[in-house]
Amino acid sequence: SVRDADSEKKSLFDGDEEWKVSHINGYLIAAPDVYVQPRRSPVSEWVPAMTFGSMANDGGNLILQPEEADFLMMKYPRLKEEGAIRPFIGSEEYINRKQRYCLWLLGIRPEVYENIPEIQRRIQAVKSFREYSPRAATRKLAKFPEIFGEIRQPEQGKYILVPRVSSWRRSYIPMGFLPAETIASDAAQMVPQATEELFGILTSAMHMAWVRAVAGRLKSDYRYSSSIVYNNFPFPDLDRESADDIHEKAARVLAIRE
């Protein structure tokens, strides 16, 4: 019967080891059926929000390969001086140390780029791409073809970049601080106004145990989401001594990386 089947012992495996347990839940652990639900904001009040990076929604026309960026900055030095070409980084670029750039014309005076044919061609291509989109929201963006479709980049300071997907073979998720001048793509997530204390907790064994338990998976790799993983994580309230200790150790890790 169904009741007899429910009462039978189940087998739970870890490598070559097998355990007999009474119940296996959706996280593949011997525990009751309790599931983490998505949240829109962190359960811990002291941590800043995690967001996606900025989405170009441009048909690839605002994105530059390193040689394209170098050519434009050499031919038109003012583009570099004004910050119109920025490093552009997502999960793959961060993890594999790849370089990409983007045209970042938000807040840049039109006189800086309006007479540059290479840029004007790209802007017109973005406009056409958006105008012919089946999505009404994207078509509206055709009015502003020189800028990204969704902009979430902090204007100053630094942020922690967190890859959306990373290998399960790693003992921790590779993440780190980047300056506001480096544009985070929507292929990654970021935490603006982040501190060394937050970095220390996010790269801790405690947080990784949480990731392994509740994060989604792509094949076997971790899919880190703000709504499930970050927002539900019970970040501990830190007294001054604990905060200073975490800050010191995180700063040491960051210094070794450099």
Model region roles, listed by residue range:
Residues 1-8:
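Conserved beta strand-loop-helix elements of the APE1-like EEP
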Residues 12, 16-255:
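Polybasic, glycine- and aromatic-enriched phosphate-binding surface used to engage nucleic acids
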